[in-house]
Amino acid sequence: MGLFDFLFGKKKQDPSFTLGVVNFFKGEDNPSDLMVVGFVKGSIKVGDEIVVTNMSCVTETPVKTTVLSLGVHGSMVQEASDTTVMAIVRDGTKLGIYKGTVLHSENTPDTELCNAYTVALGIAFVDEQEGKLTKEDCEKLAASDISEIWQLYYRVHAEEAKQFEAKQVLLKYKRREFYKLIREKLFLLDDVYVVYSVETDEPYLFSNASKDEKGSLFVTMPMAQLIPSSYIHNLKEMFGKNENFDFKRIDNGPDKEGIRNFIRDLFIYDGIRGIQYCGEKTTILAEQLVDLPRYKGMDEIEIPVTNPNLIQWLYLARQLGKLNTKDKKTLSQVYLYQFYEALKTAKLLAPMRLHGYDQLLEENPQTDVEPNIPFDLAMQPGQTKELTLRVYTDWKRLRKHYGEDCKALIVTIDEQLAFHDVVINPGDHPMAASTITEEWYNEVERK
């Protein structure tokens, strides 16, 4: 080491440590102090300044306190390394510490924090409490904590549930319990992040494709993935360097209805059947989360036009990106064929401008009968024909581009292709739209 480095060089950082809280008790000498039990990774000493982190609620300003005493196997010690400890934390009762809280040095990497967090949850709620949450646990734990506990519990018990029916029944019961708590807490959050597709600028559809015993391709129900805002700094660890993903914040609003309405719209408009929260093992169907519209007994013309199946297959195809592998090409063919099948019976909305007498469609802005007055449909230059008719799969997408007062003519694809090309959901993102020509439509039909 040179003189400059000796005098002015950076000091070597102290080794990091973590202590994931498995249990806690009020201090005997001072009621504001807290006695915590957990496994320490690294070395912790009496007098150390520690940072208190709840992974479900990461704050911008670190919460700090001091270790007052340490105990290992019933004996008081000044230092402990890589072992289970009992530590008394100054003013710990005021710092929001609960099972799963991580106490750590200031220089601890995020990966070590996450490891300490999951280990603590696993020991506390899977090993010791066997998936049973106390009333206090339910009050303190966040939705993301409960999701993590469920995934740890599932990982431990999934294999034996396949072998024993009683274990399978218990696992399903536990899932219902955990999901009920997640639902209750999810809608009370201030916000949540959603994984979006870079290709479509719409929520990414998480779905898996596999072949059954007969060789037929099976595609799982598409899900949206929701991420707690406290996890947003750790996305690289969760998703790697996947350039197909973007992340957008959903504000729950002052009435706490934003997340609920967002999930409801995913089901109605995008064909997304549910959500994954903090990982694919916490998968909750939309009908278990929100009230969905029921149209039984309504006149068909009164039912708002939606095409979730059409959107689902279009977006799954678009998410494939470049078809540079055999599997991608196969999936593309499957998705586009299913898109075509949905297209054959789809009712679509063509934006319509009436020349006078707008009151004819005041009560219901959609009609399947051409008005007996002059009107225009939205057109743009065609690809194979002179003009392309602009149509939308639902009112939400139509109004985004044409406003709340727009009227629409309900059309089907086959009746239009003889006269025009048709573009579905034209807008700012070409990959979220699809241009249909008569030639393409007939070619797919022949296959």
Regions found by a protein language model. Give the residues of each.
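An interfacial alpha-helical scaffold signature
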Residues: G2-K12, L113-K447
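Beta-strand/loop-dominated core regions that host nucleotide or nucleotide-derived cofactor-binding catalytic loops
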Residues: Q13-V119
